[in-house]
């Protein structure tokens, strides 16, 4: 019996474990976007300079084509507080007077026979959660797609190797050309459908993960 209990416990603990996708450098999903240049018809002007390859001093340097680079200024700050209280009380009482039989009360050793029952239950739970995050920095991203309304789909990542681990920042989302500043930057609060990921790999990142036994106590499998 003990053997089956141990096997069942191992299966439950194995079910609590999750197979998390580990990020890797040079992920093809975040590879730089190389735009396809349209064919340029040669202009028979007799000059060595072509208008299609000329750049004006007044040309807008802000990203607007597929493959252009734009810098995202990360200014993220979030704070969340949550509390929950739950209290359940339940009780019941049952009393019966002395039992009558043959015109008089039923007695045992001279004491009238009566019935009584009483029970109560009180369950109280409290939970508090407080979390705050702040992210500051810059990351350059490529323009992945230009939508029909002119909005730009961007995506990029940055890897930094520090001591015994690697840290990375990833960003994807949609921006408006109007939100791009003259120095070709856009703040992260202006990125729609933003997916900003800041994490790491290595010894330092692994030390912040919750152990498998703690995951069991924090999971829905823990009955208390």
Curated annotation (Swiss-Prot):
One of its GO terms (biological process) is bacterial-type flagellum-dependent cell motility. It is a lipid-anchor. One of its GO terms (molecular function) is cytoskeletal motor activity. PROSITE patterns: PROKAR_LIPOPROTEIN. The keyword Transit peptide does not apply. InterPro entries: Flag_Lring. It comes from the Bacteria. It holds the Pfam family FlgH. It is found in: Cell outer membrane; Bacterial flagellum basal body. A lipid is attached at residue 16 (S-diacylglycerol cysteine). GO terms for cellular component: bacterial-type flagellum basal body, distal rod, L ring; cell outer membrane. Keywords: Bacterial flagellum, Cell outer membrane, Lipoprotein, Membrane, Palmitate, Signal. The keyword Lipoprotein applies. Its main location: membrane. Residues 1-15 form the signal peptide. NCBIfam families: PRK00249.1-4, PRK12698.1. Assembles around the rod to form the L-ring and probably protects the motor/basal body from shearing forces during rotation. This is Flagellar L-ring protein. It comes from Shewanella amazonensis (strain ATCC BAA-1098 / SB2B). The gene is flgH.
């Amino acid at each position: 019996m003990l053997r089956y209990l141990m096997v069942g416990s191992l299966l439950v603990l194995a079910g609590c474990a999750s197979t998390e996708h580990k990020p890797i450098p040079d992920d093809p999903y975040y590879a730089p976007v190389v735009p396809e240049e349209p064919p340029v018809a040669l202009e028979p002007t007799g000059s060595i300079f072509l208008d299609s390859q000329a750049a004006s001093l007044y040309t807008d340097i802000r990203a607007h084509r597929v493959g252009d680079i734009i810098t995202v200024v990360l200014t993220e700050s979030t704070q969340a507080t949550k509390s929950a209280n739950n209290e359940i009380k339940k009780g019941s009482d049952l009393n019966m007077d002395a039992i009558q039989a043959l015109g008089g009360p039923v007695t045992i050793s001279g004491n009238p026979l009566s019935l009584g029952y009483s029970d109560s239950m009180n369950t109280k739970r409290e939970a508090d959660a407080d979390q705050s995050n702040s992210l500051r920095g810059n990351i350059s991203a490529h323009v992945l797609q230009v939508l029909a309304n002119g909005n730009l789909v961007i995506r990029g990542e940055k890897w930094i190797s520090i001591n015994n681990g690697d840290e990375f920042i990833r960003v994807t989302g949609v921006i408006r050309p109007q939100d791009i500043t003259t120095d070709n930057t856009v703040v992260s609060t202006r990125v729609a459908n933003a997916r900003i990921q800041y994490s790491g790999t290595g010894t330092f990142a692994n030390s912040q993960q919750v152990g498998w036994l703690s995951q069991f106590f924090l999971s829905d499998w823990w009955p208390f």
